[in-house]
Curated annotation (Swiss-Prot):
Subcellular localization: Plastid, Chloroplast thylakoid membrane
Official protein name in the record: Oxygen-evolving enhancer protein 2
Keyword DNA repair among record annotations: no
Function: May be involved in the regulation of photosystem II.
Main location: plastid
Family recorded in the similarity comment: Belongs to the PsbP family.
Induction: By light.
Cellular component, GO annotation: chloroplast thylakoid membrane; photosystem II
One GO biological process term: photosynthesis
Length: 43
């Protein structure tokens, strides 16, 4: 889980703007700390 003060731009991925925090998802970076369901999509 990554929380930054700005919207991260990652290639071949997409970023979610969440109030008070920014969560980014990418093919190379799975958000295992955020959602387990997201990991299931990449297995």
């Amino acid at each position: 889980k990554k929380q930054t003060g700005f919207t991260p731009f990652i290639g071949n991925g997409f970023s979610l703007d969440v109030p008070x925090s920014i969560t980014e998802y990418g093919p190379x970076e799975k958000x295992e700390d955020n959602f387990d369901a997201t990991n299931n999509l990449f297995v």
